[in-house]
Every structure is written in C-alpha cells, then in structure tokens.
Amino acid sequence: MLLPIAGLLDKLVYFPPLSQTKMKLFDTKIIAVSNQKGGVGKTTSAVNIAAYLAVTETPTLLIDMDPQANATSGVGIEVGSYKQSIYDVVIGKAKLSDVVQKTDLEFLDVVPSSAQLVGAEIELVSLFSRERMLKEALEDVEGKYKYIIIDSPPSLGLLTINVLTSANTIIIPIQCEYYALEGLSQLLNTIRMVQKHLNKEL
C-alpha cells in the first residue's frame, strides 16, 4: 500500500514538541586554565581571556573553581555578596544557571567561588559520578555561551579532575624555572589519565 508523503514522514520521523527541545545558540568551547602551582598567572590569564572575549562581544562565562575566589573579585564581584557559589553546584545543591552573576561587561557572566569550596573535595568523595559533577552541571547552560573559561584550583584533587573532565581545551600558564617544570610533568600525567578514562575530547 502506498502512503501519502506526509503520512510516510510521520511514521519515519519523530519531531518532539517545542517544549521538549532545548535551543542551542552556540557550540560552546570550554577552556580550562590550569596549573597546580600557585603564582604562575593562572587566574590572571583566565580573567583576561574571559574579559577579552567579552569585549569582542562574544558571550562568555567565567567559572571560578579556585577557593581563593580571585577570579570572582577580578571581574568586579564582591566575594561573599552572593548566596550561592560554584560550591553549591558541584555538590549538587544548585543549578549552574541559578548561580550565574552578571558583571559590568555586557557579554561576560561569572559563576563565583567561595571559601566553602575547600571542603567540597571531601564531600565529593561520597557522591556518585563525583568526577563528572561539573560536566553534568554545565548542561544547564549548554549553548548559551560561545566560550566557558574555567579557573582551576591550584591542586590536582577532585575539583581539578572535574574541570578537566568538563573541558575540551586546556591552557597551562607556566614559569620557566625548575620547580614549575617539575610540577608540569605531574599535571601532564593527570591530563593523560583524564583523556584515557574520563574525557577523550580534552
């Protein structure tokens, strides 16, 4: 029996209602700025990259994953002036979109940090899929920003693993001196482990 073209398409293709679809404006690039050694310009790099992108009218989200919250204050947000932070997101108590703060730059938003993030490593240990908490949270803003810049914590713990599992690009600021290069080899080993087991897109 021959079916009308419209009837045939109805049988072959399912179009979900608009209420069930999520509009993606952008294919988002997620960039981690990471180095477990302090004082190498990690946060300065993350803030300036995010600010430059915003000045070029590129929708950008800066995520502060460092408990010192220097990236938060670096874009003009007073630390502690908000009720929730990235801490609440990574332990599953808040949606990422509910924590986003506007900055003075039209195209730059920030997810602020707080000192509470220090204790998140311990809380994450007991959670299922603890290495992917940030990656899953990012789905909440998928397609809204062209770039997401993540300022990683100065460590190689679970928070940094979360950052590396979420990113598809990594920038490693480094000083050309012995101890910085020694720490680089540890970071590269961690990156290879994440690429092998958690995030092949990194």
Question: Where does each model-flagged region fall?
Answer:
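P-loop NTP-binding core
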Residues: 1-202
